[in-house]
Amino acid sequence: MKAIKVNAGRTAAVQPARMPKLRDGYLLCKVHCVALNPADWKYLDFIGVQGVTLGADLSGVVEEIDPSCGAHFEKGDRIAAFVHGGNVSQPDDGAFAEYCLVKADLALKVPDAMSDEDAATLGVAVATCGQALYQGLELPLPGGAPYDGFLLVYGGSTSTGTLAIQYARLSGCKVIATASPHNWPLLKELGVEETFDYKDPDCAKKVRGIPICKAGYLTDGALIRAFTSDSLVLALDCIAEGDSAKICEDSISESKGGTICYLFQAKHSRADIVDKRVFAYTVFGEAFDKFGQSWPARAEDFARGKEFAALASQMLSDGQLRPHPVRLGKDGLEGVLDGLQQLRERKVSGAKLVYRVVETP
């Protein structure tokens, strides 16, 4: 089979690869489509351990099932999944391949009406939303007692952002979001209360409800506070770079404080704000090394991830979740390499790059 492997010098190429060997609790998936995430190129450029397979998001069909998986899946079932690409402990686990192992308890069942291309956008975003919204920010699960308050989603037009907006609204939140103005119509379709341009120097104060003086300039992030009348206590930062942490911090109520959940490492300066960091790879419940740190196995994260995957599969079947918009690339796995460069150059906004593996030359 073929896969995208990391070579010496932190480069990557499509090359022959061994078929993954089935492990306890895993399915063997024939990969139909893969989707790209910023973590893919960042891992390659900043760590890039030779010999590992890249990629985290996929859709495909079940080819083989480990007996320990139970009766949840059958051969031929369509699935979407988040897999641990760039994993030195299991170097063949990446999504950018013709075949890939998928942890059965975390796999999503794909409805008949959903395309493989749309399904490929779901895996990472579903797992991340589960950890960020329901473990980190402790929102009630959809169907429970609703949360009666605002949630800020910074980076609302990312794949995680659009799904977080939908989940949060189903949990009762009044969602506000930051995004580039050209992506505002998408967020409005998803039901956000208001959108804010993260490049606006007054962004956070407009959210919190601070009067905006037309003469002179206010601090960065100053717009969000106005809309919430200084009541915002929960924020999800899907970007965690540039000014995102500062804008989220400035948006949080000065009278109440609050909690910010970051998808990557970030810092704030306010003592009345609690940090929560999400690192979605812990959802597998397995120890690993990544980005210069050793991460122990987290049984609780796996248990919660299993519960959330089952809920997500049901919600997808019921038509409650809308996949992120797709930008379909060409040339299969070879095209993925070009897609990684597009992500490096910040050329993709409001859509997810997806590639059909069968189109690999």
From Swiss-Prot:
Substrate binds at residues 124-131, 280-284. NADP(+) binds at residues 39-42, 157-160, 180-183, 198, 260-261, 348-349. Keywords: NADP, Nucleotide-binding, Oxidoreductase. GO terms for molecular function: nucleotide binding; oxidoreductase activity, acting on NAD(P)H. CDD domains: enoyl_reductase_like. Its EC number is 1.-.-.-. Pathway: Secondary metabolite biosynthesis. It is an enzyme of class 1 (oxidoreductase). Gene3D superfamilies: Medium-chain alcohol dehydrogenases, catalytic domain, NAD(P)-binding Rossmann-like Domain. Oxidoreductase; part of the hps1-dma1 gene cluster that probably mediates the biosynthesis a derivative of cyclopiazonic acid (CPA). The hybrid polyketide synthase-nonribosomal peptide synthetase (PKS-NRPS) nps1 might incorporates acetyl-CoA, malonyl-CoA, and tryptophan (Trp) and utilizes a C-terminal redox-incompetent reductase domain to make and release the tryptophan tetramic acid, cyclo-acetoacetyl-L-tryptophan (c-AATrp), as the first intermediate in the pathway. Monomer. Belongs to the zinc-containing alcohol dehydrogenase family. This is Hps1-dma1 cluster oxidoreductase toxD. It comes from Dothistroma septosporum (strain NZE10 / CBS 128990) (Red band needle blight fungus).
